[in-house]
A protein has these predicted regions:
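N-terminal pre-Walker A segment at the start of P-loop NTPase domains
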Residues: 25-60
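Conserved lysine of the Walker
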Residues: 83
Length: 230
């Protein structure tokens, strides 16, 4: 197989190159998602670069009005359809200086640890800021203006109760979100305790991301398993 061209600006082009090389099957649904990701790449490139700020700098910036936020993407569908592969292609190409890619539950564990650390500072008299969400959001913004999550799902009430307030801060100050999920946003935290308190986050999410489904007929995970020798 010939070495592939180094496509670093278009998910569509990289997908087509991999297909032409025989590494992937042609998949119209994947190309559709790739086109959405290319739109985000273009918007990120066109946006005026944000000045690097410390967490304290972000706290002061909160008072200066909303930042320009590039609309992100929420890709949902069954497992094995290629959602994570496409997001990873996008992440590597994203023209931003600070970005983070992780599993959603890893991110939320980090958030809860930061909230706990802030409450300890409050208890020890090291801060007078009673609400931990603004400083935690400021820390996250100082570290990454682009967040890419794998497997966005909400099953824990502690996560559910914090998401709307946290992402109100993140989105308002320029954070872009690209995420994969197995469920449509309206079914996040379905039948969860006090779900009514979680629903404002769903509305917020749909305001700042385009929601698309990856309904490829092929389960590439199963295809790989079936090709293995028994």
């Amino acid at each position: 197989m010939k070495p592939l061209p180094d496509y670093n600006h278009s998910v569509v082009e990289q997908l087509n190159a991999l297909t032409a090389a025989g590494a992937l099957q042609a998949d119209a649904a994947q190309l559709g998602v790739a086109a959405h990701l290319d739109r985000i790449l273009a918007d990120l490139k066109a946006r005026k670069p944000a000045k690097k700020k410390s967490a304290l700098g972000w706290m002061f910036a909160r008072k200066s009005g909303p930042a320009t936020t590039v609309k992100g993407l929420y890709v949902y569908g069954s497992v094995g359809r290629g959602k994570t592969m496409l997001m990873d292609m996008f992440y590597e190409m994203a023209p931003v200086s600070s970005k983070r890619r992780c599993h959603f539950h890893e991110f939320m564990a980090d958030v809860h640890n930061r909230v706990h650390a802030h409450r300890q500072k409050l208890k020890n008299g090291e801060t007078k800021q009673a609400d931990p969400i603004p400083p935690v959001a400021a820390q996250l913004l100082a570290e990454a203006e682009l967040l890419c999550f794998d497997e966005f799902s909400v099953t824990d009430i502690a996560d559910a109760m914090i998401l709307a307030r946290l992402f109100t801060e993140l989105f308002a100050h320029g954070c872009t979100l690209v995420t994969t999920s197995n469920v449509v946003p309206d079914n996040l935290y379905k039948d969860g305790l006090n779900r009514g308190l979680f629903l404002p986050f769903v509305d917020l999410l749909k305001k700042y991301v385009d929601v698309v489904t990856l309904d490829s007929p092929t389960d590439y995970r199963m295809e790989k398993l079936e090709s293995l020798p028994v």
